[in-house]
């Protein structure tokens, strides 16, 4: 990944007042271990170390790593790793949560990484508002892949005025809560295929006409442009039955 591109995409929140307003929506306690994606200048990191057991900040910009370390000089329950989050290997044998004010231009890559390559039980991210809405849109493949693994909530708006430099759009604080996967391991490949055919409206490649009509009826779907994730799972289960 190009480090320069990432650095140029960063927008910081530095006002303690605004940070405190955001932190009120994040469930943390003194036993939590946190991985922070992008420490920036350490403003959120400072709040995290005061609330949690231990914070590991992952920051690709070595200058910002030093800035964060200097800001937290009075604390010892943290480490700052000068690493690319997309190459980072999350631990598989401990409990932790994730927080990050993530760059807009790699939001999809980051969210895929932390949902599918980490075991974090709770994930809090500040993302562009339009991106947050897309994560709840069952017409999009990313949403359908994520909803099988996590429950997604938009917790609050984060106005663009909170940031510097000020972006063109507002952001949101979102929470992803880990749940038992709705797709069994043996069905993962089949689910991936079904999702891509569905979002591309290639219905004839996954159902006959009669199968399609019966599946829609069984799922209680009247409008293909407005279906819930549970209805989508019903369609997938019908597809599996027809393709044993």
UniProtKB/Swiss-Prot annotation:
Pfam families: RrnaAD. One of its GO terms (cellular component) is cytosol. Gene3D superfamilies: Ribosomal RNA adenine dimethylase-like, domain 2 (1.10.8.100), Vaccinia Virus protein VP39 (3.40.50.150). It catalyses: adenosine(2085) in 23S rRNA + 2 S-adenosyl-L-methionine = N(6)-dimethyladenosine(2085) in 23S rRNA + 2 S-adenosyl-L-homocysteine + 2 H(+). It is an enzyme of class 2 (transferase). InterPro entries: KsgA/Erm, rRNA_Ade_diMease-like_C, rRNA_Ade_Mease_Trfase_CS, rRNA_Ade_methylase_Trfase_N, SAM-dependent_MTases_sf. Keywords: Antibiotic resistance, Methyltransferase, Plasmid, RNA-binding, S-adenosyl-L-methionine, Transferase. The keyword Methyltransferase applies. Its EC number is 2.1.1.184. GO terms for molecular function: 23S rRNA (adenine(2085)-N(6))-dimethyltransferase activity; RNA binding; rRNA (adenine-N6,N6-)-dimethyltransferase activity. S-adenosyl-L-methionine binds at residues 11, 13, 38, 59, 84, 101. Signal peptide: none annotated. One of its GO terms (biological process) is response to antibiotic. It comes from the Bacteria. This protein produces a dimethylation of the adenine residue at position 2085 in 23S rRNA, resulting in reduced affinity between ribosomes and macrolide-lincosamide-streptogramin B antibiotics. Belongs to the class I-like SAM-binding methyltransferase superfamily. rRNA adenine N(6)-methyltransferase family. This is rRNA adenine N-6-methyltransferase. The lineage of its organism: Bacteria, Bacillati, Bacillota, Bacilli, Bacillales. The gene is ermC.
């Amino acid at each position: 990944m190009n480090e320069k591109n990432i650095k140029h995409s960063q927008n910081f929140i530095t006002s303690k007042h605004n940070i405190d307003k955001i932190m009120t929506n994040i469930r943390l306690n003194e036993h939590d271990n946190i991985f922070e994606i992008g420490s920036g200048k350490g403003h959120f990191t400072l709040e995290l170390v005061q609330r949690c057991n231990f914070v590991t900040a992952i920051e690709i910009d070595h200058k910002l790593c030093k800035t964060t370390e200097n800001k937290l000089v009075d604390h010892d329950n943290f480490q700052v790793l000068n690493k690319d989050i997309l190459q980072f290997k999350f631990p598989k044998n401990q409990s932790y949560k994730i927080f990050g004010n993530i760059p807009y231009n790699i939001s999809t890559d980051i969210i895929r990484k932390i949902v599918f390559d980490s075991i974090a039980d709770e994930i809090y991210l500040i993302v562009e508002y339009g991106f947050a809405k897309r994560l709840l849109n069952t017409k999009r493949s990313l949403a359908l892949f994520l909803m099988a693994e996590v429950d997604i909530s938009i917790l609050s708006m984060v106005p663009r005025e909170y940031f510097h430099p000020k972006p063109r759009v507002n952001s949101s604080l979102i929470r992803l809560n880990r749940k038992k996967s709705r797709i069994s391991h043996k069905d993962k490949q089949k689910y991936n295929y079904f999702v891509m055919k569905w979002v591309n409206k290639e219905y004839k490649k996954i159902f006959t006409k009669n199968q399609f009509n019966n599946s829609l009826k069984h799922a209680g779907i009247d409008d293909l442009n407005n279906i819930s994730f549970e209805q989508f799972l019903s369609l997938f289960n019908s597809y599996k039955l027809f393709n044993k």
